[in-house]
Amino acid sequence: METALAKIPQQRQVFFLTILSLLWKSSSEAIRYSMPEETESGYMVANLAKDLGIRVGELSSRGAQIHYKGNKELLQLDAETGNLFLKEKLDRELLCGETEPCVLNFQIILENPMQFFQTELQLTDINDHSPEFPNKKMLLTIPESAHPGTVFPLKAARDSDIGSNAVQNYTVNPNLHFHVVTHSRTDGRKYPELVLDRALDREEQPELTLILTALDGGAPSRSGTTTVHIEVVDINDNSPQFVQSLYKVQVPENNPLNAFVVTVSATDLDAGVYGNVTYSLFQGYGVFQPFVIDEITGEIHLSKELDFEEISNHNIEIAATDGGGLSGKCTVAVQVLDVNDNAPELTIRKLTVLVPENSAETVVAVFSVSDSDSGDNGRMVCSIPNNIPFLLKPTFENYYTLVTEGPLDRENRAEYNITITVSDLGTPRLTTQHTITVQVSDINDNAPAFTQTSYTMFVHENNSPALHIGTISATDSDSGSNAHITYSLLPPDDPQLALDSLISINVDNGQLFALRALDYEALQSFEFYVGATDGGSPALSSQTLVRMVVLDDNDNAPFVLYPLQNASAPCTELLPRAAEPGYLITKVVAVDRDSGQNAWLSFQLLKATEPGLFSVWAHNGEVRTTRLLSERDAQKHKLLLLVKDNGDPLRSANVTLHVLVVDGFSQPYLPLAEVAQDSMQDNYDVLTLYLVIALASVSSLFLLSVVLFVGVRLCRRAREASLGDYSVPEGHFPSHLVDVSGAGTLSQSYQYEVCLNGGTRTNEFNFLKPLFPILPTQAAAAEERENAVVHNSVGFY
């Protein structure tokens, strides 16, 4: 406990002192109602909505509640109409005892916004109790020597009612010797005394019986009676006299049973039996008598435990009686001292165990504290721990509200165990703790968050449909339906991208699937956005960028751009016989639609008519000579080259290259007949045979002179016709060969053009000299060279 008390100054503390209560009462006017006790249940006390100044329906919508001290429901509120009804009969004497006025405090609490209203119901007393004497019979012993005017105390009657309904007067039945006088104590209670009017004579009348009546002030009046039996004794001159008529003593309430309280003392001047004094309790006041007295010594002890919270003062009337029956009376005023024997009590009036996370200053609990002790023992300190986002706010009449200090964050902390500590200021301090559990309810205040800011995924082309490519994942810090995420494909920025035909997504787990086979050569990569939406209301969403990269497969063989591979007439390259070793004949140009290493091409010479004469550079496809040409080398050569990529599996293409060795570029040339296809060669041979036969037939029909003339003409025409049929189709020889890669297919010094015109039955070769700057002095010579045309008829068999 000491450790806990040491921590209290470090906590948020709210001191609730009596002065605070008084200030609150003075500044906050309570709504007061009054009604008589014992009113039948169902009685309408008032219309609460009207008295509070709010609409009738507002009581229901704002969750109006009534709280009472002690948690006993005395009233019932109809929130729809605002009427306040009595739930049961109320007994003022049971609820308030002798306290006047009898005020029942209750609080009305409204929510949204939180409001408190202090309300009081005062119960007025009705005369529903009659006076009652503690004994049905009283015994008095009066000596016959008593003088008129002598006063004899009588026991008072008790009436549970208060005010005018309590005992107001005492009477005695008519007689010759006594009358009753009614006196008031300091607290207003009435008590009777019997006054002797006429001297008594024991020999004439040894006994008397009187009827003592107690009357209250109600209308109609109620009464109670007791019998007073008087014995007249022989002369007893002196009655006992107490040393003090009033004894005042203070007794702590925690004194044990049989604890000593005080000693009273009385003396009697008579001698003998008339001087012997005995002590007794004359009359106790209250429900029970917690004291006993020793009849010989006059010592008063506790017979029951005292409780300051129930009765703080006791007035004990002590009677001292001598042997002759005379008595004297004194009063012992016992003040019960409060000790800190009651721990503070905490009563939860309203509790909200589920608090929305985004609400500020939400009332979590309404509670009241009380301590039955007084003074510092009843002053209290109320506190909660520092490290939680909650505050304690005092309202009124020992009421507090526990509110959130600001908006809570369920994602940071979903549950709080709040310990409310109430300590009094007594010695030693007593402490009461109450722990409430507050759960933070989720609000959809967090959008889904992707595990990556962007995603890059790879898929090989020629994939199978429905292939699982990858998974997009998002999380939501909320809970329940607020954290349930659905995924979707967002419309692409590129309207030409048919995303719905390429990709699909599983709405529940974010798995991406390919809808069809992808082609790297058609689409290398594409981007799109994936959205994640939670199930809250309103729903929150986020999106992330997904970049899909199509990986190339080696599904394309190299494609040769040059030389053109045409089934009708392959291309022929010219090689000067005087070419030096390393002479560039041509360059094989090829491409591969694949990418990366699948498009890395290499060249290889597979086969050649003269293997040692030619070589191919592996990386650029240049075909060069490896040595000087000799007279023994053939004039025509056929090379078979292989172009292959670096993929897996490897793909390749073959290139056939024809090389014609010429003495110089100044000589006319034609491709050999053998370079044509075999089917065309066969056709040419048949045609030649027919022309020879036709020429022989015509020659035999003419005279020798005519035959010679005509024969020469016919032979020339036949040969021209034959050469015309052997002509190569136009366009098979590129007019200007340009190195696509920039390395140069032909030597920069030689650009040539071959034109074969079959329509004129002549073969024309146009040779272009190397391009050199033409000086003015050379203009004429250059002009003559430009007009040079050579006409030759050359046949290859």
Swiss-Prot record:
GO terms for cellular component: cell-cell junction; plasma membrane. Residues 1-30 form the signal peptide. The chain crosses the membrane at residues 692-712. Expressed in brain. Keywords: Calcium, Cell adhesion, Cell membrane, Glycoprotein, Membrane, Repeat, Signal, Transmembrane, Transmembrane helix. It is found in: Cell membrane. Pfam families: Cadherin, Cadherin_2, Cadherin_C_2. Residues 35-133, 138-242, 247-346, 351-450, 455-560, 567-670 form the Cadherin domain. Its main location: membrane. GO terms for molecular function: calcium ion binding. Residues 713-797 are cytoplasmic. It comes from the Eukaryota. It is a single-pass type I membrane protein. Glycans are attached at residues 169, 276, 417, 566. Residues 31-691 are extracellular. GO terms for biological process: cell adhesion; homophilic cell adhesion via plasma membrane adhesion molecules. InterPro entries: Cadherin-like_dom (IPR002126), Cadherin-like_sf (IPR015919), Cadherin_C (IPR032455), Cadherin_CS (IPR020894), Cadherin_N (IPR013164), Protocadherin/Cadherin-CA (IPR050174). Potential calcium-dependent cell-adhesion protein. May be involved in the establishment and maintenance of specific neuronal connections in the brain. This is Protocadherin-3. It comes from Rattus norvegicus (Rat).
